[in-house]
C-alpha cells in the first residue's frame, strides 16, 4: 500500500499539515507560556473526516487538557475556533451569529458533495490573504446590534475546568484532593444544555446553547428616552483606568455635535452632553449594551435633570455636596398604621387573661327623705353609707399585676396594727 502524499489512493494531497492551531483566547488559556504537542495526521476531522494535524495542550493550572477537534479548513469556512467551535469575533455559537447576520449557510452534508465543496473552498482560501472568512460569511459585511449586545468580550476560563468525576458521584472516588476531576454535583440530565453535539454546533442546528442565547436576546431590556425633552446628557459607567476622554469623543462624535464631556475618575464614569436631543437619542440607541472600548463593555444610560436629582437628594436626606444629614434627636419614629375597628375592639394590649363579667361594687344608696340616720359625733350629716366589705358569695376583682391595682394598698391594714 502506498503511503506517500503524492498517491491519490486515499486523497492524501488534501491532508492538512499546519504549524499552529486556530484558537480563541479562552481555549488557549491565560498562561502565555504553554507547552503544546503536535501530532501530524493524528485524527480525522469531525466534520469533513479528513486527517489533520492535532495539537494538544493544557490551558492552565487545574485545567483539563484540550485538543483541536476540526481541521483548519473547516475552521476558516465558519471563522470558528478549532476546539470550542465558537465564533472568533463574537465568541458566540454559529447559530446565533447566522441569525444575527440574517443569512443561512447551507453546506453539503453528504460525503461526495462535502469533499467537492471543501476542495473548492480550499482553492478560494489559497487565493485570499487568509485573514477574512470565505464563502457566505465573507460576503456578509453588515453587523448586527444583537451580536454586539450578546458578544463575549472577555475570556471565560471556567470553560476549561476538568470534567466531573464519575466515581465521586457514585461515592467511590478514593483520590481525594489529588483527583484531577471535579468533585461537584452533575447537572440535571433533563437540562437541554447537558446534551450537545459538535456537528449540530458547527452546522448551526439544534444547538441548546444558541437557543438559550436567542431567548435572552428576545427579552433584553431597552433604553427608553426620558419624557423631559431638555435632557441631552448621557451617562457612561464602568470606564476603568484605561479609558480616557479621547476614547469617548472618538466614539460619540459620529452621532452629532458634542457640547461637553465630563469624566469623573473617582466614580469611573463620564457625562456626555450633546447639542441637540436628536443626537443624544441616536447615540443612546446605537451605544446601549453595544459600547465596547479596549475590550471593556461600558454601561450607557440617560442622564437626569437637576430637578429630579434635587428631589432625590431631599428624599434621601443629603445636601448638594453629598453630606448625609443626621436625624433630629427627640422626634418620634414612624408609627404603625392604626388597627381596624374590629381589631381594636378585640385587641389585648396588656396581655391580660380573659375575665368574666365585671364585679358588682356595693354602693350604698341614699336613704329616703325623712329617715336619715343620725350622724356620728363630730361629723355633719352625710348622704352615703360607708362602703362595707363585699359579701363572700360575690366574685373578687380580676388578678393584680401592678401595686397600684391593689384596692387595699393605701392604709387598708391599718386596723390590724392599731391598739384596742
UniProtKB/Swiss-Prot annotation:
Keyword flag Metal-binding: yes
Disulfide bonds listed in the record: none
Residue spans, zinc finger C3H1-type: 159-186
Gene Ontology, cellular component aspect: cytoplasm; nucleus; Prp19 complex; U2-type catalytic step 1 spliceosome; U2-type catalytic step 2 spliceosome
UniProt KW keywords: Acetylation, Cytoplasm, Isopeptide bond, Metal-binding, mRNA processing, mRNA splicing, Nucleus, Phosphoprotein, RNA-binding, Spliceosome, Transport, Ubl conjugation, Zinc, Zinc-finger
Signal peptide: none
Modified residues annotated as N6-acetyllysine in this record: 212
A Pfam family that the UniProt record links to this protein: RRM_1
Superkingdom in the source lineage: Eukaryota
Region (Disordered): 303-343, 372-420
Biased composition (Basic and acidic residues): 309-318
InterPro entries: Cwc2/Slt11 (IPR039171), Nucleotide-bd_a/b_plait_sf (IPR012677), RBD_domain_sf (IPR035979), RRM_dom (IPR000504), STL11/RBM22-like_N (IPR048995), Znf_CCCH (IPR000571), Znf_CCCH_sf (IPR036855)
Main localization, broad class: nucleus
Every RRM domain range: 232-305
PTM-bearing positions, type Phosphoserine: 4, 102
Position of the Glycyl lysine isopeptide (Lys-Gly) (interchain with G-Cter in SUMO2) cross-link: 139, 149, 290
GO MF assignments: pre-mRNA binding; U6 snRNA binding; zinc ion binding
PANTHER family reported in the protein's UniProt record: PRE-MRNA-SPLICING FACTOR RBM22
Function: Required for pre-mRNA splicing as component of the activated spliceosome. Involved in the first step of pre-mRNA splicing. Binds directly to the internal stem-loop (ISL) domain of the U6 snRNA and to the pre-mRNA intron near the 5' splice site during the activation and catalytic phases of the spliceosome cycle. Involved in both translocations of the nuclear SLU7 to the cytoplasm and the cytosolic calcium-binding protein PDCD6 to the nucleus upon cellular stress responses.
Domain remarks: The C-terminal RRM domain and the zinc finger motif are necessary for RNA-binding.
Family, as annotated: Belongs to the SLT11 family.
Protein name (database record): Pre-mRNA-splicing factor RBM22
Organism the protein comes from: Bos taurus (Bovine)
Gene that this polypeptide is encoded by: RBM22
Amino acid at each position: 500500500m502506498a503511503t506517500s502524499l503524492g498517491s491519490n489512493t486515499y486523497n492524501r494531497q488534501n491532508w492538512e499539515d499546519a504549524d499552529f492551531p486556530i484558537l480563541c483566547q479562552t481555549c488557549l488559556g491565560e498562561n502565555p507560556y504553554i507547552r503544546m504537542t503536535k501530532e501530524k495526521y493524528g485524527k480525522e476531522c469531525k466534520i469533513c473526516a479528513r486527517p489533520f494535524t492535532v495539537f494538544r495542550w493544557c490551558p492552565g493550572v487545574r485545567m483539563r487538557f484540550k485538543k483541536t477537534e476540526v481541521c483548519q479548513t473547516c475552521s476558516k469556512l465558519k471563522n470558528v475556533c478549532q476546539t470550542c467551535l465558537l465564533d472568533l469575533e463574537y465568541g458566540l455559537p454559529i447559530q446565533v451569529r447566522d441569525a444575527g447576520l440574517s443569512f443561512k449557510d447551507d453546506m453539503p452534508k453528504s460525503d461526495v458533495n462535502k469533499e467537492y465543496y471543501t476542495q473548492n473552498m480550499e482553492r478560494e482560501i489559497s487565493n485570499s490573504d487568509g485573514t477574512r472568512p470565505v464563502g457566505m460569511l465573507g460576503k456578509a459585511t453588515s453587523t448586527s446590534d444583537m451580536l454586539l449586545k450578546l458578544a463575549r468580550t472577555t475570556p471565560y476560563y471556567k470553560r476549561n475546568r476538568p470534567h466531573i468525576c464519575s466515581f465521586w458521584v457514585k461515592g467511590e472516588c478514593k483520590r481525594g484532593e489529588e483527583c484531577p476531576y471535579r468533585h461537584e454535583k452533575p447537572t440535571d440530565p433533563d437540562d437541554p444544555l447537558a446534551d450537545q453535539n459538535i456537528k449540530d454546533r458547527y452546522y448551526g442546528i439544534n444547538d441548546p446553547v444558541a437557543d438559550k442565547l436567542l431567548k435572552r436576546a428576545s427579552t433584553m431590556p431597552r433604553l427608553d428616552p426620558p419624557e423631559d425633552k431638555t435632557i441631552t446628557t448621557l451617562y457612561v459607567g464602568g470606564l476603568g483606568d484605561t479609558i480616557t476622554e479621547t476614547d469617548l469623543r472618538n466614539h460619540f462624535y459620529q452621532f452629532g455635535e458634542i457640547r461637553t464631556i465630563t469624566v469623573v475618575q473617582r466614580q469611573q464614569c463620564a457625562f456626555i452632553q450633546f447639542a441637540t436631543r436628536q443626537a443624544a437619542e441616536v447615540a443612546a440607541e446605537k451605544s446601549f449594551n453595544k459600547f465596547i472600548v479596549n475590550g471593556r463593555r461600558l454601561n450607557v444610560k440617560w442622564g437626569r435633570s437637576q430637578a429630579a436629582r434635587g428631589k432625590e437628594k431631599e428624599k434621601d436626606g443629603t445636601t448638594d455636596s453629598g453630606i448625609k444629614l443626621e436625624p433630629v434627636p427627640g422626634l418620634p419614629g414612624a408609627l404603625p398604621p392604626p388597627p381596624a375597628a374590629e381589631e381594636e375592639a378585640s385587641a389585648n394590649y396588656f396581655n391580660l387573661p380573659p375575665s368574666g363579667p365585671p364585679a358588682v361594687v356595693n354602693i350604698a344608696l341614699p336613704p329616703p327623705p325623712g329617715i336619715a340616720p343620725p350622724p356620728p359625733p363630730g361629723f355633719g350629716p352625710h348622704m352615703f353609707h360607708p362602703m362595707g366589705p363585699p359579701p363572700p358569695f360575690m366574685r373578687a376583682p380580676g388578678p393584680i399585676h401592678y401595686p397600684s391595682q391593689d384596692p387595699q394598698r393605701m392604709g387598708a391594714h391599718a386596723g390590724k396594727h392599731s391598739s384596742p
